[in-house]
């Protein structure tokens, strides 16, 4: 299991606003805002239960040592959801915030209930509920 996942985005404000609204639907909230005056920095999202957490960044956060460009290969990140209704809200709110549909809410392999979106930078994000 991982401790955290961090991804660099082109626009911290736009991506931060997007993830703040979408992740709230599945019980994940903004925990820390390290936005700098020049628009770079990072945001930490989580449930407040320590780990794992998700980092949205722009520019090069001081704790990263590699290139700060958004990836040319989109990421696929799946978030646990507390219910089917939360998956539905995640999908609906995401579409309203500018994401593209990459899979309507529904039953998937193994009996999970999931929905998929393409975020503002082309990453495939998913909300999954497993009963």
Roles of regions detected by a PLM:
Residues 1, 70-73, 108-109:
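Short glycine-enriched loop/turn motifs at secondary-structure junctions
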Residues 1-16, 77, 131:
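N-terminal beta-strand motif that seeds the catalytic metal site of vicinal oxygen chelate
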Residues 9-10, 37, 108-110:
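Conserved beta-strand-loop-alpha-helix junction that forms the acyl-donor binding cleft
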Residues 13-29:
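Amphipathic alpha-helical segments
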Residues 28-70, 125-129:
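Conserved short beta-strand elements that form part of the metal-binding/catalytic scaffold
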Residues 44, 91-131:
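Vicinal oxygen chelate
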Residues 69-93, 97-99:
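Mid-chain, well-packed structural core segment of small domains
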């Amino acid at each position: 299991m991982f401790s955290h996942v961090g991804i660099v985005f082109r626009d911290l404000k736009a991506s931060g606003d997007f993830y703040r609204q979408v992740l709230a639907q599945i019980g994940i909230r903004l925990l820390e805002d390290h936005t700098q005056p020049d628009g770079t920095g990072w945001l930490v999202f989580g449930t407040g239960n320590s780990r794992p957490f998700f980092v949205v960044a722009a520019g090069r956060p001081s704790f990263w040592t590699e290139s700060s460009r958004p990836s040319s290969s989109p990421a696929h990140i799946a978030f646990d959801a507390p219910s089917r209704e939360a998956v539905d809200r995640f999908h609906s709110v995401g579409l309203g915030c500018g994401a593209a549909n990459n899979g309507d809410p529904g039953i998937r392999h193994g009996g999970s209930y999931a929905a998929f979106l393409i975020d503002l930078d082309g990453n495939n994000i998913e909300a999954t509920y497993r009963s």
